[in-house]
Design a protein with these regions (language model features):
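Nuclease catalytic cores that cleave nucleic-acid phosphodiester bonds
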Residues: 1-160
Length: 160
């Protein structure tokens, strides 16, 4: 199992949590970004800097992630594509995307995108994204730990 992180939008507190967790559990984490980010030195932590451009990091993650890997991203179309490959996906707020909820999330995202692009929603009506809270961090940590444990157990069972 590998963990891929869509690192450009990942809050620093989550990067720190993920790094500590993968060093403790000896799990490989690959932070994918279009610019360098400072991460701890560890044989379990890699940063993959991709070219600048639309969906370059997403395409790298989609190409490399395999069934039973874990991807951390808030990109809903990417999550949809990954789920169809059997990849576990969570966002930065700790929401697990799966085959039961991804279509609804994708539909809402597309609807809001259409509302913005047609001018029905003005920027002032959209509101600002809420700041990342301690509750968000706890929810993320709980979901991350649950999925990490589940995927690790599946891997161990496959090796038997």
């Amino acid at each position: 199992m590998k963990i891929y992180i869509d690192a450009d939008a990942c809050p620093k507190t989550l990067r720190d949590f993920i790094c500590k967790s993968v060093m403790r559990t000896k799990t490989i984490a690959i932070f994918v970004s279009n610019s360098f980010i400072n991460l701890p030195r560890s044989p379990f932590i890699t940063i993959k800097v991709v070219e600048q451009g639309f969906d370059i990091a997403d395409n790298y993650i989609l190409e490399k992630a395999q069934a039973n890997d874990l991807v951390i991203t808030s990109d809903i179309p990417l999550a949809n594509d990954l789920i169809s490959k059997g990849v576990a996906v969570i966002n930065f707020k700790g929401v697990e995307y799966n085959k039961d909820n991804i279509k609804q999330s994708l539909g809402m995202r597309d609807f809001m995108d259409m509302m913005r692009s047609t001018g029905v929603l003005e920027p002032s009506q959209m509101g600002k994204q809420k700041p990342f809270s301690d509750k968000d961090k706890k929810t993320f940590a709980d979901t991350f730990n649950r999925l990490h444990t589940k995927l690790s157990r599946m891997l161990k069972n496959d090796l038997k």
